[in-house]
C-alpha cells in the first residue's frame, strides 16, 4: 500500500498530474507477475543467509531491501526527481512481491495441512493491520508531520517483521515435496494458465 494508495496521495498533494499518478499504478503489477519469479524463490537459497533457512533467508533479505528503498523514497523529492522516486517505488513493490512468495511458502511449510486455516487467518489479520497502518495511519500522520517522516517511520515498522521471524522456527512439512527448478516453472505456469 505504501507504493500504491499512500504514494498516490503524496503525489496528488504535491500536484503531480493524474496521468503520472496513474502510471505509478503499474508498479504494483509486480505482485500480479510474481508467479514468474516464484520458481527462483522456491529453488535457490540466499548466500550468507543460509543459516536462517531457505524461506527465512529470502524474507530477511527482502525486508532489508524494502527498508532501504522505503528510506530512499523518504529522502527523495518527487517534485524534483520523479524518475528516481519511481524507480525506488518499483523496487519496493518488486521486493515486496518476492517477500510475499517467501512468506506464503514459509507459512505453508511450517505446519501440517490441518493447521493451515489458522495460519492463513493469522496472516490475513496481520496483513489487514499493516494495510490500516500503511494507508489510514500514514495519511493521518502525514497530515500532522511530513511525507519524508512517514516513510521513514514505515520503514522502521518493517523491523517488527524481524522479531516475528526470529521467534518462529522454520519447520519442514513432511507431506510437501520439493520440485526441481524446471518442474516448478512448469507447475507455476500450468497453475497460472488454468486460473486465468
Label the predicted regions:
Residues 1-28:
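Helix-loop boundary and gating motifs at the non-cytosolic
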Residues 23-44:
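Central cavity-lining transmembrane alpha-helices of secondary-active solute carriers
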Amino acid at each position: 500500500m505504501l507504493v500504491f494508495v499512500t504514494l498516490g496521495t503524496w503525489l496528488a498533494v504535491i500536484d503531480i498530474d493524474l496521468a503520472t499518478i496513474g502510471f505509478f499504478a503499474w508498479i504494483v503489477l509486480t505482485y500480479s507477475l510474481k508467479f514468474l519469479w516464484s520458481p527462483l524463490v522456491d529453488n535457490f537459497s540466499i548466500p550468507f543467509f543460509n543459516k536462517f533457512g531457505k524461506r527465512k533467508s529470502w524474507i530477511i533479505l527482502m525486508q532489508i531491501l524494502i527498508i532501504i528503498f522505503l528510506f530512499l523514497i523518504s529522502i527523495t523529492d518527487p517534485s524534483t526527481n520523479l524518475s528516481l522516486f519511481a524507480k525506488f517505488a518499483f523496487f519496493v513493490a518488486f521486493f515486496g512481491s518476492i517477500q510475499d512468495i517467501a512468506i506464503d511458502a514459509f507459512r505453508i511449510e511450517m505446519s501440517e495441512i490441518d493447521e493451515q486455516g489458522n495460519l492463513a487467518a493469522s496472516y490475513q489479520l496481520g496483513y489487514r493491520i499493516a494495510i490500516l497502518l500503511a494507508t489510514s495511519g500514514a495519511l493521518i500522520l502525514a497530515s500532522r508531520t511530513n511525507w519524508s517522516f512517514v516513510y521513514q517511520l514505515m520503514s522502521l515498522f518493517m523491523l517488527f517483521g524481524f522479531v516475528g521471524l526470529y521467534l518462529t522456527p522454520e519447520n519442514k512439512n513432511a507431506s510437501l515435496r520439493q520440485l526441481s527448478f524446471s518442474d516448478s516453472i512448469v507447475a507455476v505456469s500450468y497453475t497460472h494458465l488454468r486460473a486465468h
